C-alpha cells in the first residue's frame, strides 16, 4: 500500500482558502508524502462526480473542500461517504455558527478573494 496521500482541494472559487488551510495542516505533521490535486471553480454535480471518480482510483485520497452552496456541499459529502473517501468541509460549520451569532442568513455566494476595507467597530 502506498504511503503517498492524494489530497484533493475542491473549491467553488479560486481555492486560495483551501491552499492556506492545507499549508497550516501539513505544518503539523512531519514526514508525510502527498500529491495535491486542486480543483477551482467547481460548481456542478457533474464536476464533482468526475473528481470523485479520480479520487476513488487513487489510494489514500483525502478531500478538503470549500463550497458555499449548501446543496452542492452536501452532494459532495454524501457521494464521498458512499465511496468511502474521507471528506472535510472547511467553511460549512463556520458559516452556520456565524449565521446564528450574527442573527443573519448567509448569502452562500462564492466570491473571488478581493481586497475589502477592514471594518472596525
Regions found by a protein language model. Name each.
Residues 23-28, 79-82:
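Short, solvent-exposed amphipathic alpha-helical segments in soluble enzyme
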